[in-house]
Amino acid sequence: QLSSLQGAENYLLVFWSTGCSHCLREIPELYKFLKDTQKIKVIAFSMEENAVRWEQMKKDFPHWHHALGLGKWENKTAKTYSIYSTPSYFVLDKNKKIIEKPALFEDLKIILEQL
């Protein structure tokens, strides 16, 4: 799915979960922060045990591309990216190569402002 996205200067891959209190605070703030930019496309990969809460919550972020990873921590994609905590952020260039992996939300905002 990531390979099919086109047309952005940068991409932001966000691993999150509807059961994560940090995610529930940061993800809406991130959405507001990026709302008016066209140069960054967001891929929100939600790691869940089931799709019920995710189906409802993804509607709050209509401009993002959404993907569901059932199995939460055991999900193949989460394991591929070595996700051990949520939220986890990966900033990608236009060729979808990882250029930054900030640990803190404040660091992410600084990186995104500089793109």
Provide a role label for each language-model segment.
Residues 2-24, 30:
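Short active-site neighborhood of thiol/selenol oxidoreductases, capturing the structured segment around
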Residues 7-10, 40-42, 86-87, 105:
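Active-site lining segments that contact anionic ligands and/or coordinate catalytic metals
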Residues 72-113:
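Thiol/disulfide oxidoreductase modules built on the thioredoxin-like
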Residues 7-10, 63, 76:
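A cross-kingdom marker for long, charged
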Residues 15-16, 45, 92:
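Short hydrophobic segments within beta-strands
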Residues 64-69:
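Short hydrophobic/aromatic-enriched beta-strand-loop microsegments
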Residues 24-60, 73-78:
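Structural microenvironment flanking redox-active thiols in thiol-disulfide oxidoreductases
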